[in-house]
């Protein structure tokens, strides 16, 4: 599911590219139209892309890591660090923030929040909803990695069988 969401949302890149190129060309050629909506749409596209890719990115180990602590550990040792990190840090934090993000979106919707600019985009709750959805996708990504770590550590399966990727090798750096 995470992969499908990420790959589908990847099409937003085309929209973001088109809007950004038009915005730049309009400014360089001196088109006197108010471009506030386009400029806001640029960051909406960027925020949506980032938010909808975060969960999947974690499952494929595309997230930035500081591996100085685990670089000399065995893969099993790295899996234990990942287990502790998921259970005690990543999952509680992300779940808490994701849970409270729902109030953030509901409040924005109830207030009919819109851009501070008079010619900006309306429906600010929509992008806030995408932020919230992205946080819940991160929670799902953490649960996915956590399940694979548990199966690897306690289920007797190899890292290839559970498609577990933890840390970076020297070749990847």
State the predicted function of each range.
Residues 1-173:
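Alpha-helical transmembrane segments and membrane-interface helix-loop junctions
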């Amino acid at each position: 599911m995470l992969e499908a969401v990420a790959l589908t949302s990847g099409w937003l890149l085309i929209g973001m590219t088109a809007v950004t190129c038009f915005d730049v060309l309009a400014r360089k050629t001196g088109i006197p139209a108010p471009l506030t909506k386009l400029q806001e749409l640029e960051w909406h596209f960027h925020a949506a892309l980032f938010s909808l890719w975060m969960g999947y990115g974690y499952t494929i180990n595309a997230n930035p890591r500081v591996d100085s602590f685990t670089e000399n550990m065995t893969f099993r040792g790295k899996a234990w660090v990942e287990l502790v990190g998921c259970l005690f840090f990543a999952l509680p934090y992300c779940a808490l923030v994701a849970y409270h993000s729902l109030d953030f979106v509901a409040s924005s919707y109830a207030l009919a929040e819109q851009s501070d600019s008079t010619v900006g985009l309306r429906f600010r709750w929509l992008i806030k909803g995408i932020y919230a959805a992205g946080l819940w996708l991160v929670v799902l990504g953490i649960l996915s990695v956590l399940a694979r770590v548990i199966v690897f550590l306690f289920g007797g399966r190899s890292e290839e069988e559970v498609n577990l990727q933890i840390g970076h090798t020297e070749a990847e750096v």
